[in-house]
Swiss-Prot record:
Record's protein name: Cysteine-rich protein 2
GO molecular function annotation: metal ion binding
Gene it is expressed from: Crip2
Organism: Rattus norvegicus (Rat)
One GO CC term on file: cell cortex
Tissue expression summary: Expressed more abundantly in liver and kidney of females than that of males. Equally expressed in brain, lung and heart.
Length: 208
């Protein structure tokens, strides 16, 4: 049975489909959520399950402010600040109260966990190791929360950065060489000059 395109909600037939983010799209429906540029499967960033072009849109919306992820440049699209920080002076806390709080018991594990839980009150589970992901150690990609070291290429296990990797069937891959080897045109390293053919049978005869 043909699936539904998540962009236009119409049936996607085999001849017109591309697969990305674990879903089937019409080729011209796989567009950046911000600028509407047509994207290629695995050649785009992702945030909350939606596709974005790497530059400038993903870097503008979700990258470190003023830094274009993956290259030099600045992509700041924010309104200029109209007000200076209204700080009239340092806030002083009596030393006695601080000491009293320390003697009553310093915050430990439970309070830390409660500060990093999700809206449901429960930490999310990492799709790689199936363990809880707390705020201080999480990165978000493919609509899921991962431990930083767990967001790795499915093929070579290289650690990846959120939005800086390819995707196939909901799994993360590095762009080069792994995604190009597995899912790109045979003999072509997608996105750069070179040849990356890793057939299962290296001793097999070369097809003309």
């Amino acid at each position: 049975m043909a699936s539904k395109c998540p962009k236009c909600d119409k049936t996607v037939y085999f001849a017109e489909k591309v697969s990305s983010l674990g879903k089937d799209w019409h080729k011209f429906c796989l567009k950046c959520e911000r600028c509407n540029k047509t994207l290629t499967p695995g050649g785009h960033a992702e945030h909350d399950g939606k596709p974005f072009c790497h530059k400038p849109c993903y870097a503008t919306l979700f990258g470190p402010k003023g830094v274009n992820i993956g290259g030099a440049g600045s992509y700041i699209y924010e309104k200029p600040p109209t007000e200076a920080p209204q700080v009239t002076g340092p806030i002083e806390v009596p030393v006695v109260r601080t000491e009293e709080r320390k003697t009553s018991g310093p915050p430990k594990g439970p309070s830390k966990a409660s500060s990093v839980t999700t809206f449901t009150g429960e930490p999310n589970m990492c799709p790689r190791c199936n363990k809880r992901v707390y705020f201080a150690e999480k990165v978000t990609s493919l609509g899921k929360d991962w431990h930083r070291p767990c967001l790795r290429c499915e093929r070579c296990s290289k650690t990846l950065t959120p939005g800086g990797h390819a995707e196939h069937d909901g799994q993360p891959y590095c762009h080069k060489p792994c995604y190009g080897i597995l899912f790109g045109p045979k003999g072509v390293n997608t996105g750069a000059v070179g040849s990356y053919i890793y057939d299962k049978d290296p001793e097999g005869t070369v097809q003309p």
